[in-house]
UniProtKB/Swiss-Prot annotation:
Quaternary context: Part of the 50S ribosomal subunit.
Xref: SUPFAM superfamilies: Ribosomal protein L6
PANTHER family tied to this protein: 60S/50S RIBOSOMAL PROTEIN L6/L9 (PTHR11655), LARGE RIBOSOMAL SUBUNIT PROTEIN UL6M (PTHR11655:SF14)
Biological processes annotated in GO: cytoplasmic translation
Organism: Bifidobacterium adolescentis (strain ATCC 15703 / DSM 20083 / NCTC 11814 / E194a)
Statement: the UniProt record of this protein carries the keyword rRNA-binding: yes
Classification via Gene3D superfamilies: Ribosomal protein L6, alpha-beta domain (3.90.930.12)
Keywords assigned by UniProt, alphabetized: Ribonucleoprotein, Ribosomal protein, RNA-binding, rRNA-binding
Cited function: This protein binds to the 23S rRNA, and is important in its secondary structure. It is located near the subunit interface in the base of the L7/L12 stalk, and near the tRNA binding site of the peptidyltransferase center.
Gene from which the chain derives: rplF
The protein's name: Large ribosomal subunit protein uL6
Lineage: Bacteria, Bacillati, Actinomycetota, Actinomycetes, Bifidobacteriales
InterPro entries according to UniProt: Ribosomal_uL6-like, Ribosomal_uL6-like_a/b-dom_sf, Ribosomal_uL6_a/b-dom, Ribosomal_uL6_bac-type, Ribosomal_uL6_CS
GO cellular component: a single term: cytosolic large ribosomal subunit
Keyword Ribonucleoprotein in record: yes
GO terms for MF: rRNA binding; structural constituent of ribosome
Amino acid sequence: MASHIGKLPVTIPAGVEVKIDGQSFTAKGAKGTDSYEIPEGITAVVEGNEVVLTPADDLRPTRAKHGLARSIVAGMVKGVHEGYAKTLEIVGTGYRAQMKGKGIEFSLGYSHTITVEPPAGIEFELPNPNQVIVKGIDKQAVGQCAANIRKLRAPEPYKGKGIKYADEHILRKAGKAGK
């Protein structure tokens, strides 16, 4: 019994160059270069325009790593080809963001402003003061950076004020009942 995800081949799109050196996997594309150390017990082979990952045995931990490695490789190939982006929306009166160099300065109702510098490989975009786009080639880094920004002022359930993902729905609570 093999991993359902792991047994699927990863298609390499045109313009993406893949190199496998032992357990080291490198993908190079229009957006940049990314590399990953494939776990022990998993071998990767390029067959035509696909990357196929195969487990050395059928033990449960190896099957789990097989699916994980395949997902990470697929994410890397997509990242260097198209890139990843997460959009955050800032909701609330007086809550806004503005570019400050490469970083962003947030006004979120605190007594001070908060400045966030982008980590390596990540860039910010501000289409308007109430919207932040986090872009990069590493899916995990983009998601983590977006989560760190959201954490600065997570949406509250009564008025929905705070920083939320563009596709996120905030569950609302009824306020206290008046007399």
